[in-house]
């Protein structure tokens, strides 16, 4: 790939970097500690990677070099928790008087609406 029998020549590297700049390309090394790529079913984790960003006419390309570890993706578990809402006597009276229903009906509507006065009134109004 490199002229000169494949041996690395630092002067040649400087010439290549100058040519890249002339063509509107710029490369910069980033001091990354860890890179994680999230796939559908797993994670790829690069510890101590070499990361280089190349800017070519405004488009940035990131190059990651290093050894990747495949890590199982943990499912985020959200548990359904039943919350019992305390319904105040004041709220029950308000819903009861607004809708012309008994206090028991007003309390039930408030509990079903998780204490939301407006929702309980709308529910009883229909």
Swiss-Prot record:
Key words of the record: Protein transport, RNA-binding, Transport
Highest taxon above the source species: Archaea
Pfam families reported for this sequence: NAC, UBA_HYPK
GO BP annotations listed: protein transport
Domain NAC-A/B: 10-77
GO MF: RNA binding
Gene3D superfamilies (alphabetical): DNA helicase RuvA subunit, C-terminal domain, Nascent polypeptide-associated complex domain
Subunit record text: Homodimer. Interacts with the ribosome. Binds ribosomal RNA.
Family: Belongs to the NAC-alpha family.
Role, per record: Contacts the emerging nascent chain on the ribosome.
Name listed for the protein in its UniProt record: Nascent polypeptide-associated complex protein
Organism the protein comes from: Methanococcus maripaludis (strain C7 / ATCC BAA-1331)
Gene encoding the protein: nac
């Amino acid at each position: 790939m490199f002229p000169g029998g494949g041996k690395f020549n630092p002067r040649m590297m400087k010439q290549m970097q100058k040519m890249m700049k002339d063509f509107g390309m710029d490369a910069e090394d980033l001091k990354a500690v860890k890179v994680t790529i999230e796939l559908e079913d797993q994670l790829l984790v690069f510890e101590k990677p070499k990361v280089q960003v190349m800017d070519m006419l405004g488009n940035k390309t990131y190059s990651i070099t290093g050894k990747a570890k495949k890590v199982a993706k943990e499912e985020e578990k959200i548990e359904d928790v039943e919350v019992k809402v305390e319904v105040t006597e004041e709220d029950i009276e308000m819903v009861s008087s607004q809708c012309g229903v008994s206090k028991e009906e007003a309390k039930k509507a408030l509990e079903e609406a998780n204490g939301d006065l407006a929702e309980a009134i709308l529910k009883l109004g229909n």
